[in-house]
UniProtKB/Swiss-Prot annotation:
Protein name: Short-chain-enoyl-CoA hydratase
CDD domains: crotonase-like
Biological source species: Clostridium acetobutylicum (strain ATCC 824 / DSM 792 / JCM 1419 / IAM 19013 / LMG 5710 / NBRC 13948 / NRRL B-527 / VKM B-1787 / 2291 / W)
Record-level Gene Ontology MF annotations: lyase activity
Gene behind the chain: crt
Family assignment from sequence similarity: Belongs to the enoyl-CoA hydratase/isomerase family.
Length: 261
């Protein structure tokens, strides 16, 4: 697939995905969503990639939202299809077995906030702005905002942000738990890469199963979640990485890399 709006790069075991529509503040149109879907598939099938960083081109905007110029003439059926496409792509990103870090530079509004929330970890530049302003445009959040925001910041705060169409600064996003860390713009990508490299230095199977267990637990009762955790925990003992790491620990030496098996 020819990529016009998304850039995929690899730096060792880390994939860097850049949404590249700076003239449109990296707004998400249908073509960009389809390219994102393709890129996620490429990452899924690349065994060398163990972590992902998602960012936006330029310093002004991570993703300013869904593309209003495309949406304004949509009818009910077209709007529903657009929402289904966005939700499909964001859910696929969320379920990717490899941890995904959002490096949020500038505006993360509407679909931009929603795609950031689909990532596992969110690092924001100090000039970042977050919000779900859709009701001010006569629509609801359509790419998961009504569901993921409340899971991250609580129902009351999610309702306040969505009902008021209020945008918040990075430090407020940190305070309410929407982002993990705020750094200066010049340090954003370095910080994201530092975290990604810490992740890929650990046992990949254990990281993958930990992500699955956390995600599963958010969608079911505690007993079902704990049963899944026990299965994941047990599965780790079938891996070479577990044997090698525990042997190295007992022998008081550092393990010389994991094999991802």
């Amino acid at each position: 697939m020819e990529l016009n709006n998304v850039i995929l790069e690899k730096e060792g075991k880390v994939a860097v995905v850049t949404i590249n529509r700076p003239k449109a503040l990296n707004a998400l149109n249908s073509d960009t969503l389809k390219e994102m879907d393709y890129v996620i598939g490429e990452i899924e099938n690349d065994s060398e990639v163990l972590a992902v960083i998602l960012t936006g081109a330029g310093e002004k905007s991570f993703v300013a939202g869904a593309d209003i110029s495309e949406m304004k003439e949509m009818n009910t059926i077209e709007g529903r299809k657009f929402g289904i496409l966005g939700n499909k792509v964001f859910r696929r990103l969320e379920l990717l077995e490899k941890p995904v870090i959002a490096a949020v530079n500038g505006f993360a509004l509407g679909g931009g906030c929603e795609i950031a929330m689909s990532c596992d970890i969110r690092i924001a530049s100090s000039n970042a702005r977050f919000g779900q302003p859709e009701v001010g445009l006569g629509i609801t959040p359509g790419f998961g905002g009504t569901q993921r925001l409340s899971r991250l910041v609580g129902m009351g705060m999610a309702k306040q942000l969505i009902f008021t169409a209020q945008n918040i600064k990075a430090d407020e996003a940190l305070r309410i738990g929407l982002v993990n860390k705020v750094v200066e713009p010049s340090e954003l990508m370095n910080t994201a890469k530092e975290i990604a490299n810490k992740i890929v230095s650990n046992a990949p199977v254990a990281v993958k199963l930990s992500k699955q267990a956390i995600n599963r637990g958010m969608q079911c009762d505690i007993d079902t979640a704990l049963a899944f955790e026990s299965e994941a925990f047990g599965e780790c003992f079938s891996t070479e990485d577990q044997k090698d790491a525990m042997t190295a620990f007992i022998e008081k030496r550092k393990i010389e890399g994991f094999k991802n098996r």
